[in-house]
């Protein structure tokens, strides 16, 4: 049996797969999204939350390009909080507690309603090949789907093994079988692969928790949503609870460390440093006598509670003992035990910045298969792969994500240049240009790019145009004004009486000056809405820093323009250490800027590469 032909086939309908398929379809591609079950599209396999520090920036950027995660999270959000609110706007991150069922249903609706996107139920066991090129997929029932490109978003399913204590069994996640035939097929491509692990905590019955003695955590009164299209929260808002481990909890865990899958030697994969298991916390932070736990309800009509902070691979009986030693959980019932899951991943240095494999034309990888952890990182990669697979088919240039224009660009560059030694997670600290890569201006940075690509719909175009007009009007009023220090002082604003005239934007850049303070000086600003006021304030706050940062951005762009040929032989370059030759060969940097970020790179080594490139240019032009 043969299915209809498609332009792009996406394998897997998790966060990466859904975003990849939707992006490809928005680009006009006939797209097939293959999932074991349509009901599994959009399942939140781990924590019931979207966003956070760095992660919230990724969701905003996905939304700016008309991706779906932000809209779906807003529809399913049952508690919204802006993290790092006390710090500067550049490092604040929106986060939402989500109703698992609402999220899954909203994502399925997005997939079903997208023109050009077809959902196919089945298991992919092999690739269709035309020579050395991937040209579609083969399903378990023997049927085939032909395509010009395939995007693999297998999550934790490639040779996945679930560990609970000393009991191990195959599984892609609890209740689902792993993908072994596809993993074996990837072996045939001789890709650099390894094993990683992640974990999840036991799920608790909220009806058996004593909420009355726990600290209550409410959401923000004025919730900050993800999508630039959303007007307000859709679902009823709820509170979460906070409790802590204690000395008794730690003693139970310490006594049973040898029974943990991780410490008992059953797991070879490396886990995420920034989301450690409770066993890891007890060992690595032995001086701490308590760890915070957030009790997060999984839905409005669901009694299940996710105890964020105690993921584990201890045996079930130990899980019951240590959980019931925690305040408020003395009588709790465990609905599903926590577990660790180990799975295959591909060294992302084998990928191009488009997330394609140079040695396997037609194949793109996105999500946890590339060594990342987290829904948001997966979704962002899915969109990158979907857009780039489409532009390649259309004969267009690759999508120019870079460290200067997006957190997406930072992540892709980190992965493809530096690789991973542990599951990669996004943080604001990874972005050197984070002052200009704020969550609030993601649309200003990326929606024009989306309009140029053709992946942005009419509604977003119109919303963006209205916002841009409001910002331009307010900015023009500020820029065109001019005030003496005395005039500024009469408005109650304290600045140096140095005799220098300043425009409104320069005044707004002073500490503690707010947009409202300038209304007496520029009455036309009185009609400016709250969102525009806040955005202009942030632009002014960082204006001087960003101006200085632009010099670094320009230097990076010059280095990015110095392209390194894909067949450049680093091993033949005298003067480089063998270690650096190996790292450069693995990373295959596409330009001098990327080469400079390879671990162990020195100015002298970079000069050698530049000299060889220039000799090659002269030889070609001779």
From Swiss-Prot:
NAD-binding protein involved in the addition of a carboxymethylaminomethyl (cmnm) group at the wobble position (U34) of certain tRNAs, forming tRNA-cmnm(5)s(2)U34. GO terms for cellular component: cytosol. GO terms for biological process: tRNA methylation; tRNA wobble uridine modification. HAMAP family: MnmG_GidA. FAD binds at residues 12-17, 124, 179, 368. Signal peptide: none annotated. It comes from the Bacteria. One of its GO terms (molecular function) is flavin adenine dinucleotide binding. Keywords: Cytoplasm, FAD, Flavoprotein, NAD, tRNA processing. It is found in: Cytoplasm. Homodimer. Heterotetramer of two MnmE and two MnmG subunits. This is tRNA uridine 5-carboxymethylaminomethyl modification enzyme MnmG. The gene is mnmG. Belongs to the MnmG family. The keyword Iron does not apply. Its cofactor is FAD.
């Amino acid at each position: 049996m043969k299915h209809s032909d498609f332009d792009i086939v996406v394998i897997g309908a998790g966060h990466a797969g859904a975003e990849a398929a939707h992006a490809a379809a928005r680009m006009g591609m006939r797209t097939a999204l293959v999932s074991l079950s349509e009901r599994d599209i959009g399942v939140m396999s781990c924590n019931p939350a979207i966003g956070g520090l760095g992660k919230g920036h990724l969701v905003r950027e996905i939304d700016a390009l008309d991706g779906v995660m932000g809209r779906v999270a807003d529809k399913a959000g049952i508690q919204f909080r802006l993290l790092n609110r006390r710090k500067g706007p550049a490092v604040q991150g929106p986060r939402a507690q989500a109703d698992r069922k609402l999220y899954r249903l909203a994502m399925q609706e997005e997939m079903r309603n997208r023109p050009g996107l077809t959902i196919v139920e089945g298991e992919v066991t092999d690739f269709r090949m035309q020579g050395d090129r991937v040209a579609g997929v083969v399903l378990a029932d023997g049927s085939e789907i032909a395509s010009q490109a395939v995007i693999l978003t297998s999550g934790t399913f490639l040779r996945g093994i679930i560990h609970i204590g000393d009991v191990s069994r195959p599984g892609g996640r609890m209740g689902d079988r792993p993908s072994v035939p596809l993993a074996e097929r990837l072996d045939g491509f001789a890709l650099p692969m390894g094993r990683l692990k992640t974990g999840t905590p036991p799920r608790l019955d909220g009806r058996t928790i004593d909420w009355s003695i726990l600290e209550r955590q409410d959401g923000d009164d004025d919730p900050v949503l993800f999508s630039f299209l959303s007007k307000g929260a859709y679902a009823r808002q709820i509170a979460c609870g906070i409790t802590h481990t204690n000395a008794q909890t730690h003693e139970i865990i310490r006594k049973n460390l040898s029974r943990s899958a991780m410490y008992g030697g059953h797991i070879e994969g490396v886990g995420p440093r920034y989301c450690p298991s409770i066993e890891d916390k007890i060992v690595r932070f032995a001086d701490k006598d308590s760890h915070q736990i957030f009790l997060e309800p999984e839905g409005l009509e669901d009694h299940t509670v996710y105890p964020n902070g105690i993921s584990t691979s201890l045996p079930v009986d130990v899980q019951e003992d240590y959980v019931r030693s925690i305040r408020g959980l003395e009588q709790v019932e465990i609905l599903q035990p926590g577990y660790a899951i180990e799975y295959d991943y591909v060294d992302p240095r084998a990928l191009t910045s488009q997330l394609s494999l140079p040695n396997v034309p037609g194949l793109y990888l996105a999500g946890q298969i590339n060594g990342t952890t987290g829904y948001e990182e997966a979704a962002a990669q899915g969109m990158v792969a979907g857009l780039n697979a489409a532009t390649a088919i259309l004969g267009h240039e690759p999508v120019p994500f870079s460290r200067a224009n997006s957190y997406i660009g930072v992540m892709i560059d980190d992965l493809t240049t530096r690789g991973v030694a542990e599951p990669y997670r996004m943080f604001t600290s990874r972005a050197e240009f984070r002052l200009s890569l704020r969550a609030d201006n993601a649309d200003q940075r990326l929606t024009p790019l989306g309009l140029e690509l053709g992946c942005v719909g009419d509604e977003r175009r119109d919303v963006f145009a209205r916002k841009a007009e409001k910002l331009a009007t307010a900015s023009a009023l500020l820029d065109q004004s001019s005030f003496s220090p005395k005039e500024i002082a009469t408005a109650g604003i304290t600045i140096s009486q140095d005799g220098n005239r300043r425009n409104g934007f320069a005044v707004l850049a002073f500490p503690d000056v707010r947009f409202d303070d300038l209304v007496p000086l520029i009455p036309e600003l009185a009609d400016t809405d709250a969102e525009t006021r806040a955005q202009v304030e942030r632009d002014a706050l960082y204006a001087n820093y960003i101006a200085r940062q632009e010099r670094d951005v320009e230097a990076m762009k010059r280095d990015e323009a110095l392209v390194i040929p894909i067949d450049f032989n680093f091993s033949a370059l005298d003067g480089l250490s063998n270690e650096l030759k190996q790292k450069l060969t693995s990373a295959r940097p596409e330009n001098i800027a990327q080469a400079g970020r390879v671990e162990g790179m020195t100015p002298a080594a970079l000069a050698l590469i530049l000299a060889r490139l220039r000799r090659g240019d002269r030889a070609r032009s001779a």
